[in-house]
Design a protein with these regions (language model features):
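Histidine-acidic metal/acid-base catalytic patches
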Residues: 1-34, 42, 74, 115, ...
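Short histidine/acidic/glycine/proline-rich micro-motifs that form metal-
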Residues: 15-16, 55-57, 86-91, 125-128, ...
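Residues that cap or flank secondary-structure elements
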Residues: 15-16, 60-61, 99, 136-137, ...
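Active-site acidic/histidine proton-transfer and metal-coordination neighborhood
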Residues: 23, 67-79, 89-199, 206-207, ...
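Conserved beta-strand positions in the central sheet of alpha/beta enzyme cores
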Residues: 37, 82-84, 120, 157, ...
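Short, basic/glycine-rich phosphate-binding loops at helix/coil junctions
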Residues: 80-84, 244-246
Length: 313
């Protein structure tokens, strides 16, 4: 018997880009979510799908705005699980790297003001350089970010998405924190408990890795969890092989429509005593025809998730 009532289920706000913060929070509350991960990109044009969403503009987050957000959350009986911003902090263009890191640092300060415990992001990567070269740059750029997080009592959750899907990210992808072997090296460089993972099992599926074992091995580093599924088209994979760009053989799916064994996943979280937040992330193209399709995807996924993690009584 699972005892997952210690875990809260939330919604990643990126799938509702055209709604206001209060509309997102109200929608999530009405659907039966416990919390929300709020996207906090700088205001501007998105460079990729699901990016560039600004539900909180932290550049305008003064004391009055902060108090307004607190009161709004209280009205809806909701809270924010984490502030999300997913750029490439190790971008080879130094001006971009500095801009991205600067916003992450501002996000840490904003999380402190809002009383939000986690900032979720990517480590980043120069896709044209190998892992060792990128680790050297990581060792230069990331320790000051984590020191700032420690000073503000904020945890950083690094998502394990390789950010490699098409030729646009070829050959290495735009995020270094992709596998347990690399996580170990990142944690050797930055052993701080403030630096951990925003774990998404779907990314292990299409890398042909076990999505359950990391729960057992790295639970102490789990600061946040994303609930997303993925389906690997085995017939297509037979034709294109693992050297193809990943979207040639796999598709992101809502939980229950892909290859993740969600019963085993939640049992593993239960076994390790995870009591953090797990937020549904919707990136399923089969449900992008209209806002009603998006809502249907959210509802279907939540029904599946709640079969393992019931609503708290």
């Amino acid at each position: 018997m699972m005892k997952t009532n210690g875990m809260d289920i939330g919604l990643v706000s990126a799938i509702l880009p055209d709604r206001t913060l209060e509309e997102v929070v109200g929608f999530a509350a009405g659907r039966g979510f416990d919390c929300v991960e709020i996207m906090c990109w700088p205001v501007g044009k998105a460079e990729r799908r699901y990016a560039g969403v600004t539900h909180i503009d932290i550049d305008r987050l003064d004391e009055h705005a902060t108090e307004g957000i607190r009161q709004m959350l209280q009205r809806h009986g909701m809270r924010i699980s984490g502030l999300g911003y997913y750029p490439n902090p190790l971008d080879p263009d130094e001006s971009k790297s500095e801009l991205f890191i600067g916003h992450i640092c501002n996000l840490i300060r904003a999380a402190d003001r809002l009383g939000v415990p986690v900032v979720n992001t990517f480590v980043g990567r120069d896709p044209s350089r190998n892992v060792d070269d990128n680790l050297r740059v990581f060792a230069e750029k990331w320790p000051p970010i984590v020191k700032l997080a420690e000073a503000h009592n904020i945890r950083i959750g690094i998502e394990n998405c390789p950010m490699y899907f098409t030729n646009d990210e070829w050959p290495g992808g735009k995020n270094l924190a992709t596998t347990p072997a690399i996580w170990d090296r990142l944690f050797e460089i930055i052993p701080s408990p403030a630096f951990g993972l925003n774990y998404d099992p779907s990314h292990m599926v299409w890398q042909m890795m076990d999505p359950i074992q990391p729960v057992l091995d790295y639970a102490h580093r789990f600061h946040h969890v994303h609930l997303k599924d993925a389906h690997v088209d085995r017939e297509r994979l037979k034709r294109v092989g693992i050297m193809a760009t990943p979207l040639e053989y796999h598709s992101p799916r809502i939980p229950g429509r892909g290859d993740v064994d969600w019963k085993a996943f939640f049992e593993a979280l239960d076994r390790v005593g995870y009591k953090g937040d797990a937020c549904l992330e919707v990136e399923d193209k089969d449900f992008e025809g209209s806002s009603l399709d998006v809502e249907r995807a959210i509802d279907m996924a939540l029904v599946h998730i709640r079969s393992f993690v019931p609503t708290k009584s």
